[in-house]
Amino acid sequence: AIFKVKFLTPDGERTIEVPDDKFILDAGEEAGLDLPYSCRAGACSSCTGKLLDGRVDQSEQSFLDDDQMAEGFVLTCVAYPAGDITIETHAEEKL
């Protein structure tokens, strides 16, 4: 399945189509978005985004706790879209 992912970045808003088997960070970079990252393995918080709408599958992440995930925080480097989503990027400082 292919879903619409709306990125809310410091540079503005952008919506792209992302298949359900592609990491959100990778898809955003391929679309030319300048997104933060470091480890690319779900083990740090550099790429953190805040999910404003929709659901993701980030079962491969190992950094966020259940409370942070319940608040909508997402590690974009290991998160797949599980439907149409809206995500605020550059959210590490809000953790």
Curated annotation (Swiss-Prot):
Superkingdom: Eukaryota
Main subcellular location: plastid
InterPro entries tied to this protein: 2Fe-2S_ferredoxin-like_sf, 2Fe-2S_ferredoxin-type, 2Fe2S_fd_BS, Beta-grasp_dom_sf, Fd_pln
Subcellular location: Plastid, Chloroplast
Keyword Transport: yes
GO BP terms in the entry: electron transport chain
GO terms under cellular component: chloroplast stroma
Cofactor field: [2Fe-2S] cluster
Alphabetized UniProt keyword annotations: 2Fe-2S, Chloroplast, Electron transport, Iron, Iron-sulfur, Metal-binding, Plastid, Transport
Annotated [2Fe-2S] cluster binding sites: C39, C44, C47, C77
Domain 2Fe-2S ferredoxin-type positions: 3-93
Gene Ontology molecular functions: 2 iron, 2 sulfur cluster binding; electron transfer activity; metal ion binding
Keyword Acyltransferase: no
Cofactor mode of binding and number, as noted: Binds 1 [2Fe-2S] cluster.
Family: Belongs to the 2Fe2S plant-type ferredoxin family.
Entry function: Ferredoxins are iron-sulfur proteins that transfer electrons in a wide variety of metabolic reactions.
Protein name, as recorded: Ferredoxin
